């Protein structure tokens, strides 16, 4: 469960290391975001010469949460930290060309097949 002010790790090579959620998109009073939801983030920590810089406001999709996700068979997939993949503000496609760490099968929608194909492991 991601809400405003939540700090997330970045699971791609866009140049951002750490981001903070500033808005959960989808509804006027929506409070929490789960895996597969799009959020608005600001870059808090970035590497030199990256594609994004500190202070940039971008969209991101949540790929891992500590809360986890429940499957229809009752299994719960949880992770050690919260992570997201930075998206282009207009096209909502990933800015980075590599994804680090596992992602869940819940991302298998038309919009996020690129993330699934780049990920080293899909749980």
UniProtKB/Swiss-Prot annotation:
Pfam families: Ribosomal_L14 (PF00238). Keywords: Ribonucleoprotein, Ribosomal protein, RNA-binding, rRNA-binding. Gene3D superfamilies: Ribosomal protein L14 (2.40.150.20). The keyword Hydrolase does not apply. GO terms for molecular function: large ribosomal subunit rRNA binding; structural constituent of ribosome. InterPro entries: Ribosomal_uL14, Ribosomal_uL14_bac-type, Ribosomal_uL14_CS, Ribosomal_uL14_sf. SUPFAM superfamilies: Ribosomal protein L14. SMART domains: Ribosomal_L14. One of its GO terms (biological process) is translation. GO terms for cellular component: cytosolic large ribosomal subunit. PANTHER family: 50S/60S RIBOSOMAL PROTEIN L14/L23, LARGE RIBOSOMAL SUBUNIT PROTEIN UL14M. Binds to 23S rRNA. Forms part of two intersubunit bridges in the 70S ribosome. Belongs to the universal ribosomal protein uL14 family. Part of the 50S ribosomal subunit. Forms a cluster with proteins L3 and L19. In the 70S ribosome, L14 and L19 interact and together make contacts with the 16S rRNA in bridges B5 and B8. This is Large ribosomal subunit protein uL14. The gene is rplN.
